[in-house]
From Swiss-Prot:
Residues 1-10 have a biased composition (Polar residues). It is found in: Cytoplasm. GO terms for cellular component: cytoplasm; cytosol; death-inducing signaling complex; glutamatergic synapse; nucleus; postsynaptic density. The keyword Membrane does not apply. Heterotetramer that consists of two anti-parallel arranged heterodimers, each one formed by a 17 kDa (p17) and a 12 kDa (p12) subunit. Interacts with BIRC6/bruce. The modification N6-acetyllysine is found at K11. Keywords: Acetylation, Apoptosis, Cytoplasm, Hydrolase, Phosphoprotein, Protease, S-nitrosylation, Thiol protease, Ubl conjugation, Zymogen. GO terms for biological process: anterior neural tube closure; apoptotic process; B cell homeostasis; cell fate commitment; cellular response to staurosporine; DNA damage response; epithelial cell apoptotic process; erythrocyte differentiation. This is Caspase-3. It catalyses: Strict requirement for an Asp residue at positions P1 and P4. It has a preferred cleavage sequence of Asp-Xaa-Xaa-Asp-|- with a hydrophobic amino-acid residue at P2 and a hydrophilic amino-acid residue at P3, although Val or Ala are also accepted at this position. Involved in the activation cascade of caspases responsible for apoptosis execution. At the onset of apoptosis, it proteolytically cleaves poly(ADP-ribose) polymerase PARP1 at a '216-Asp-|-Gly-217' bond. Cleaves and activates sterol regulatory element binding proteins (SREBPs) between the basic helix-loop-helix leucine zipper domain and the membrane attachment domain. Cleaves and activates caspase-6, -7 and -9 (CASP6, CASP7 and CASP9, respectively). Cleaves and inactivates interleukin-18 (IL18). Triggers cell adhesion in sympathetic neurons through RET cleavage. Its EC number is 3.4.22.56.
């Protein structure tokens, strides 16, 4: 693999440029009607991509080279999955909150699901607008079951490409839709969310200036290959393996040389999710 510049999505590292070496379905499909989300609504749903590349000078945060590659790759991938993709670039923290609030107030009753992708600098529990931090919980709370009723019981996917701390992973050698008869039942307001983080809590998240981030590269590749074959959690497991085994940082600074990364999936989904129906 060609060596190109690689960075991490953390506000605390400046001018770091290491390199990389590297539903509902008929029973004939094998998908259980009772155990999978209904994905045959008239529309698949919205996919909101917030792509923050340039930050206000007052923040001290560097430009995120390579993020436009991620945004373009995501746009193509989710359009191919029949999502309505809306790209937003360089949003302030206030604009992020306003956008998410407005989207949560839309009528999603004819949509099967919702996807939000956040590409930015970050820390644990935080994503950065171009002028400062936003608590991730503030963003996702707009879509809770008690606040966005038209998405209640539907999968809400948040994909987050950002650092979650300043730790570096050195690696180690190894051998190796609510049914009608259930409509009156209550469900937890936090149910049916999935958070796909690019890295484990506390760690850096690596991004390549030419090819985009390791995580988004891998996610798009696995969705393109398996979205019409596998359940989403199985796809994400393959994403984890791809990031863990196929990528490693290269830097003349020994501190940042030969580092690894593992994505982290937090699922509150209550059914299996298939993108095909």
């Amino acid at each position: 693999m060609e060596n190109t510049e690689n960075s991490v999505d953390s506000k605390s590292i400046k001018n770091l440029e290491p390199k990389i070496i590297h539903g509902s379905q008929s029973m004939d499909s094998g998908i259980s009607l009772d155990n999978s989300y209904k994905m045959d609504y008239p529309e698949m749903g919205l996919c909101i991509i917030i792509n923050n590349k340039n930050f206000h000078k007052s923040t001290g945060m560097t430009s995120r080279s390579g993020t436009d590659v991620d945004a373009a790759n995501l746009r193509e991938t989710f359009r191919n999955l029949k999502y309505e993709v809306r790209n937003k670039n360089d949003l302030t923290r206030e604009e992020i909150v306003e956008l998410m609030r407005d989207v949560s107030k839309e009528d999603h009753s004819k949509r099967s699901s919702f996807v939000c992708v956040l590409l930015s600098h970050g820390e644990e529990g935080i994503i950065f607008g171009t002028n400062g931090p936003v608590d991730l919980k503030k963003i996702t709370n707009f879509f809770r079951g008690d606040r966005c009723r038209s998405l209640t019981g539907k999968p809400k996917l948040f994909i987050i490409q950002a650092c979650r701390g300043t730790e570096l992973d050195c690696g180690i050698e190894t051998d190796s839709g609510v049914d009608d008869d259930m409509a009156c039942h209550k469900i937890p307001v936090e149910a049916d969310f999935l958070y796909a983080y690019s890295t484990a809590p506390g760690y850096y998240s690596w991004r390549n200036s030419k090819d985009g981030s390791w995580f988004i590269q891998s996610l798009c590749a696995m969705l393109k290959q398996y979205a019409d074959k596998l359940e989403f959690m199985h796809i994400l497991t393959r994403v984890n393996r791809k990031v863990a085994t196929e990528f490693e940082s290269f830097s003349f600074d020994a501190t940042f040389h030969a580092k690894k990364q593992i994505p982290c999936i937090v699922s509150m989904l209550t059914k299996e999710l298939y993108f095909y129906h």
